[in-house]
Amino acid sequence: MPGERPTDATVIPSAKRERKAITLDLKLEVLRRFEAGEKLSQIAKALDLAISTVATIRDSKEKIKASSQIATPLRASRLTRHRSAVMESMEQLLSLWLEDQSQPNATLSAAIVQEKAEFDDLQREHGEGSQTERFHASQGWLVRFKECHCLPHFKMNSAAPSNKDMYTEMLKSIIEEGEYTPQVSLT
């Protein structure tokens, strides 16, 4: 048939480019170069970005500059999908809280961070439109949050820290109730 490809021809599938997260720092560099008067194609070539990407960064200049005022590190990559204002606010507050908790040798349990991430009070603050959004601070969310906000240095225990303490307290109560002496309880 005239419209079909020959069967002996090898078909090379087009390679889909991997999505590249652009850091806020790089976006600010693009904007700085625009303000200095560089052309769009020159910026794209110098920073190894697509021209359409550089144009999109130029068009969303106000949003990028507003994001740079927030306390997240400049090397943090911006999320590529749209997040609600309540979710962004919660993640910013949680990031600040984690930075405050950054004492040497301090480990946080994942359960504490996930509990802190619940944003019911923020939803009430933002009104009824945000009440419909559901959020569960899952383990996967926590991993992505740490990666997005450049927080890999925080050590988080996934196990509850109370198991060891609970066993110690139970043992003490058994010893006291049975009126055992320390020598008898160790044998």
UniProtKB/Swiss-Prot annotation:
Location in or out of the cell: Nucleus
DNA-binding region (UniProt annotation): 40-60, 111-148
Keyword annotations: DNA-binding, Nucleus
Major localisation: nucleus
Domain annotation HTH psq-type: ranges: 13-64
GO cellular component, one term: nucleus
Signal peptide annotation: none
Domain HTH CENPB-type: start-end pairs: 78-155
Keyword Nucleus in annotation: yes
A GO MF term: DNA binding
Name of this protein: Putative CENPB DNA-binding domain-containing protein 1
Organism: Homo sapiens
